[in-house]
């Protein structure tokens, strides 16, 4: 027989047999209908409360035949509710619905929260867009103003360039004029220098002529004096003296004529148009004196510059010595630090240690010695001193503690 756990099918069979039993007059039919009703009620109870493998179930055929059997796992699997019963299924469904409702409510709340956040962000975005629009408007206005300023500046610059070109042309003309004037002055100076040279030459020649004339006059005066002496000595002889006196007078007249001629020559040379006046000569000598003064000033400045250079050489030599000393001290210090870094600290509790190390840096070297004491496993102290091996080096030292945990 086949078990029909469906409540609808069982109810239909029960209704069929009940209606048949009411119409029948046979007691067997009535009993059969009652049995079917009981089995159906039992099955309905199982449909509501559920069943499991091993429990008693009743199979009712279409003709009303009832078969009692123990439920198997296959019967439980074949049941519409998998043996759970309508009550359990409804309970599970109610629980699932409640859970789904809670999940839906939570999701709705989360969605509402997200919507609020999005609304806030949208409002912030709108405000930011408004600020951006305002900033863009301000930027556009500023750019427009800047463009106007650039245009105005360009026009003013163009005008200024034209004015500058005109001024440059005027300056160029002025420079050309000054250049021509300077050239004229240079030519005039060259001519003046030439005339000065010629004047100096003429003055030297006049001076030499004057000296020669003076020498001739002196010689002739001496000759006249000698002749006069001789005339006085010869006064005893009248005729002879008269003749000699006339001769001497003639010579004196000749000497005076020569003197007058020399004076005229000197005057002519002194008044010549090719000779500078005294004022012009004085001006030339003033310029020469100015050049001499400038030369003396330049000599003074040159001497001062030479002294300054000598002072700088002295300072540079001192600075070079200072740098050399600093380089040596630095290398000594690095060598001493290298030696100090090689010292060991004590490792055993309650023990002193004595340690030594050497260190070096380039051409300098140093020796370091130190001692330490470990008080506990966690705490120790040490100290050390280092001295360079070269002369004049200073000592370096360190003191340190160590705590471990």
Swiss-Prot record:
<keyword id="KW-0812">Transmembrane</keyword>
<feature type="signal peptide">
    <location>
        <begin position="1"/>
        <end position="23"/>
    </location>
</feature>
<keyword id="KW-0472">Membrane</keyword>
<feature type="region of interest" description="Outer membrane translocation of the passenger domain">
    <location>
        <begin position="312"/>
        <end position="350"/>
    </location>
</feature>
<keyword id="KW-0130">Cell adhesion</keyword>
<comment type="subunit">
    <text>The non-membrane anchored protein (residues 24-350) probably forms a homotrimer; it is assumed the mature protein forms trimers in situ. The mature protein without the membrane-targeting segment (residues 24-350) binds to human heat shock 90 beta protein (HSP90AB1) both in vitro and when incubated with human monocytes.</text>
</comment>
<feature type="transmembrane region" description="Beta stranded">
    <location>
        <begin position="382"/>
        <end position="388"/>
    </location>
</feature>
<feature type="transmembrane region" description="Beta stranded">
    <location>
        <begin position="364"/>
        <end position="375"/>
    </location>
</feature>
<keyword id="KW-1134">Transmembrane beta strand</keyword>
<feature type="region of interest" description="Coiled stalk domain">
    <location>
        <begin position="88"/>
        <end position="350"/>
    </location>
</feature>
<dbReference type="GO" id="GO:0007155">
    <property type="term" value="P:cell adhesion"/>
</dbReference>
<feature type="coiled-coil region">
    <location>
        <begin position="87"/>
        <end position="170"/>
    </location>
</feature>
<keyword id="KW-0843">Virulence</keyword>
<feature type="region of interest" description="Translocator domain">
    <location>
        <begin position="351"/>
        <end position="405"/>
    </location>
</feature>
<keyword id="KW-0998">Cell outer membrane</keyword>
<feature type="region of interest" description="Head domain">
    <location>
        <begin position="24"/>
        <end position="87"/>
    </location>
</feature>
<feature type="transmembrane region" description="Beta stranded">
    <location>
        <begin position="394"/>
        <end position="405"/>
    </location>
</feature>
<keyword id="KW-0175">Coiled coil</keyword>
<keyword id="KW-0732">Signal</keyword>
<comment type="function">
    <text>Adheres to and induces bacterial uptake by human epithelial cells in a microfilament-dependent process. Binding is reduced by pronase treatment, suggesting there is a protein receptor on the human cells. Possible human protein receptors include integrin beta-1 (ITGB1) and oxidized low-density lipoprotein receptor 1 (OLR1). Binds to extracellular human Hsp90 (preferentially the beta isoform, HSP90AB1) on monocytes, binding stimulates monocytes in a TLR4-dependent fashion, polymixin B, which binds NadA, blocks the activation. Hsp90 is probably not the first receptor on human monocytes.</text>
</comment>
<feature type="transmembrane region" description="Beta stranded">
    <location>
        <begin position="350"/>
        <end position="360"/>
    </location>
</feature>
<feature type="coiled-coil region">
    <location>
        <begin position="181"/>
        <end position="329"/>
    </location>
</feature>
<dbReference type="Pfam" id="PF03895">
    <property type="entry name" value="YadA_anchor"/>
</dbReference>
<protein>
    <recommendedName>
        <fullName>Neisseria adhesin A</fullName>
    </recommendedName>
</protein>
<dbReference type="GO" id="GO:0009986">
    <property type="term" value="C:cell surface"/>
</dbReference>
<dbReference type="InterPro" id="IPR005594">
    <property type="entry name" value="YadA_C"/>
</dbReference>
<comment type="similarity">
    <text>Belongs to the autotransporter-2 (AT-2) (TC 1.B.40) family.</text>
</comment>
<dbReference type="GO" id="GO:0009279">
    <property type="term" value="C:cell outer membrane"/>
</dbReference>
<dbReference type="InterPro" id="IPR045584">
    <property type="entry name" value="Pilin-like"/>
</dbReference>
């Amino acid at each position: 027989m086949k078990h029909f756990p469906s409540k609808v099918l069982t109810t239909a069979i029960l209704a069929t047999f009940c209606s048949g039993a009411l119409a029948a007059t046979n007691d067997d039919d009535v009993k059969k209908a009652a049995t079917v009703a009981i089995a159906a009620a039992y099955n309905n109870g199982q449909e509501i409360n559920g069943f499991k493998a091993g429990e008693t179930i009743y199979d009712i055929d279409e003709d009303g035949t009832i078969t009692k059997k123990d439920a198997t796992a296959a019967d439980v699997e074949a049941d519409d509710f998998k043996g759970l019963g309508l009550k359990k299924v409804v309970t599970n469904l109610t629980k699932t619905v409640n859970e789904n409702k809670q999940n839906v409510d939570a999701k709705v709340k989360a969605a509402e929260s997200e919507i609020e956040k999005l609304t806030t962000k949208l409002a912030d975005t709108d405000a930011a867009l408004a600020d951006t629009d305002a900033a863009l408007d301000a930027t556009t206005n500023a750019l427009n103003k800047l463009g106007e300023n650039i245009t105005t500046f360009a026009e003013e610059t163009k005008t200024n360039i034209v004015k500058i070109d005109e001024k440059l042309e005027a300056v160029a003309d002025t420079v050309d004029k000054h250049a021509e004037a300077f050239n004229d002055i240079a030519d005039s100076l060259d001519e003046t220098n030439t005339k000065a040279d010629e004047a100096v030459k003429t003055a030297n020649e006049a001076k030499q002529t004057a000296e020669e004339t003076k020498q001739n006059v002196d010689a002739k005066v001496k000759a006249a004096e000698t002749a006069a002496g001789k005339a006085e000595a010869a006064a005893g002889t009248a005729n002879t003296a008269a003749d000699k006196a006339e001769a001497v007078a003639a010579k004196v007249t000749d000497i005076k004529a020569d003197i007058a001629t020399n004076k005229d020559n000197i005057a002519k040379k002194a008044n010549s148009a090719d000779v500078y006046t005294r004022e012009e000569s004085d001006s030339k000598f003033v310029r020469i004196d100015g050049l001499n003064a400038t030369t003396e000033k330049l000599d003074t400045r040159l001497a001062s510059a030479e002294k300054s250079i000598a002072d700088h050489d002295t300072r540079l030599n001192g600075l070079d010595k200072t740098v050399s000393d600093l380089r040596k001290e630095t290398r000594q210090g690095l060598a001493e630090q290298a030696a100090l870094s090689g010292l060991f600290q004590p490792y055993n509790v309650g023990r002193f240690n004595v340690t030594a190390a050497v260190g070096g840096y380039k051409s300098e070297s140093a020796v370091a010695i130190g001692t330490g004491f470990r008080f506990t496993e966690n705490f120790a102290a040490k100290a050390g001193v280092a001295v360079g091996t070269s002369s004049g080096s200073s000592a370096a030292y360190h003191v340190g503690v160590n705590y471990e945990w």
